[in-house]
């Protein structure tokens, strides 16, 4: 006779597992205002792009960020023969007297400026917020792209115009280039800071033929005193006069090259920022600088609005803003020793304003405050010396 053994229920039925509880996302308890505060502290456009892909909520909040920093990893330019020939053909038809001077005096910076122009191209594409901010570690562009991006070595590069396209409420924008446009020799100091509206408002240039770092022994001794002793040739004993050798050994010519080069670099940056300024009408401040600290272009809210309202005077042949006729003031010291022991050889400070500027000529506070330390101190020391006035025609 067969014996039937009753089948027992599975253990899961005898001891059922407790229902799984959903993990709590604590970010859901944070109000949007707090998250936006965090995103504004982050600032970096590529990091914000990565935040976009975390959640739908983050994706919807990132476009509302008002403080954005674009750090450019590389500047890509087409160096093949076809690109070079096309550049030559375009520039050849518009070559004029200034073009000849430009090539003669500052030919060394033509190629970097062309690369900057290609980097800040105005092509547009319909990409998402997440894609535009995080799909590449390099933000760059060549001149002949379609859609504001280019592939190089399997990496997609984007233009700032494309990257910033989906940010709706930017108030403070900072773009940092990987290096300055002006190729200078090792040991040479060249810094500039320019402000623009629809054209140049002012520019300050600080240069030195060489920089001698502080001697530790002299610095320690200086800390024990309450006075700063200027190096020979930098004090008031010579009344700040420029020595005759400055005119005969090429010193003046070199300063002219520094000035023209800096103005061209500044006006090229300004010209290439137009698409971003036109699109982002909420901007209160725009800064275009470089990681070398060589040049800084600044625009405040009034200056940004002026550019939108007034037509831009542009030099289309060289892709830059037309520089107006200028009044310049120059200060020079053969040797300038700073309080920290740094010595500047051939220290030169140039303050530039348009000839038609209605601002008070005697006010030079904007000159001495143009740079960060230790160069702010250098500027303050130089403006106490004899002033030399120069003029420059529009170019």
Swiss-Prot record:
Biological process terms in GO annotation: heat acclimation
Stretches with biased composition (Low complexity): 125-142
InterPro entries to which the protein is assigned, alphabetical: AUF1-like (IPR044809), F-box-like_dom_sf (IPR036047), F-box_dom (IPR001810)
Domain F-box stretches: 24-72
Region (Disordered): 122-158
Domain of life the protein comes from: Eukaryota
Name recorded for this polypeptide: F-box protein At5g46170
